[in-house]
């Protein structure tokens, strides 16, 4: 045994296992590394950080309006695709963004990002929808209350913030998810590839669906008289949206 130990080569790796030391010989192997991205076609704007958002719209007079819950219901038709960046926060439900949410996103992302190699832009407008509120202890009646604050309505599928630059998705995924968890609606960090993969998976589920009893088939055939409990909106959206909530598993 001692003769075998004398033949051990000089360069050894020593590792500590509990109360004893074990000597391991060095080993070499083939390594395949991914090519390093060059970011040759990426241009950084002069003002790369998120801009400050006004708390009140700069208009002479704002009219009070009803709730209009249709502003947060259903799929979004604006800001659904990338424009300049490659990463963004995708809204998975409807809701209202207050001025505090804009400040939270601006301060968190600007503190993290490198302005020389990254940039971020808003994809949603500043708060413009007035929300009225009456004081505590005030009697009912007397007309609509005074304007208390302003919000920005967001629908499902809307990109809230967009980021890009000389960086990869794994570098910004953590900070984007941290911001997404603090929003008043479900959201997640996505990239161009992950967003396209989500749309592709949804199309494949619709084409390869083997269950004939879909919501569209049941509602169209008026089974058990279900049409009297549905609205025209349920027929156009095929039951995938319930108010501001989105049900992605429904085909």
From Swiss-Prot:
GO biological process per UniProt: mitochondrial translation; translation
Ribosomal protein as UniProt keyword: yes
Subcellular location field: Mitochondrion
InterPro entries: Ribosomal_uL16, Ribosomal_uL16_bact-type, Ribosomal_uL16_dom, Ribosomal_uL16_sf
Primary location: mitochondrion
Pfam family name, one: Ribosomal_L16
Single GO MF descriptor: rRNA binding
Record bears the keyword Ribonucleoprotein: yes
Entry superkingdom: Eukaryota
Transit peptide: 1-29
Keywords: Mitochondrion, Ribonucleoprotein, Ribosomal protein, Transit peptide
GO CC term (a single one): mitochondrion
Gene3D superfamilies: Ribosomal protein L10e/L16
Disulfide bonds: none
Complex and partners: Component of the mitochondrial ribosome large subunit (39S) which comprises a 16S rRNA and about 50 distinct proteins.
Similarity comment: family membership: Belongs to the universal ribosomal protein uL16 family.
This protein's name: Large ribosomal subunit protein uL16m
Native species: Mus musculus
Gene behind this protein: Mrpl16
